[in-house]
Amino acid sequence: ERRAERESQMRADEEFGSQVQYLTQQRRARLPWRREGRSFDEEFRELRNVDEEERRDMMIE
């Protein structure tokens, strides 16, 4: 049972990781000049900020 739990957690982590990767690629496609020399953490923080901005924009509309 515990192994199944661990496996589903791993699957969830993988899924989340590939989502972040996908979003990062999308983001980079939009902002090619920001790509060089950025750490994953910076990318991720910026992705989160963009999500929050987009949510705010949706609320305003």
Curated annotation (Swiss-Prot):
GO terms for molecular function: nutrient reservoir activity. Keywords: Disulfide bond, Protein synthesis inhibitor, Seed storage protein, Storage protein. GO terms for biological process: negative regulation of translation. Belongs to the 2S seed storage albumins family. The mature protein consists of a small and a large chain linked by 2 disulfide bonds. IC(50) of translation-inhibiting activity is 17 uM (small chain) and 300 nM (large chain). This is a 2S seed storage protein. Inhibits cell-free protein synthesis. This is 2S seed storage albumin protein. It comes from Cucurbita moschata (Winter crookneck squash).
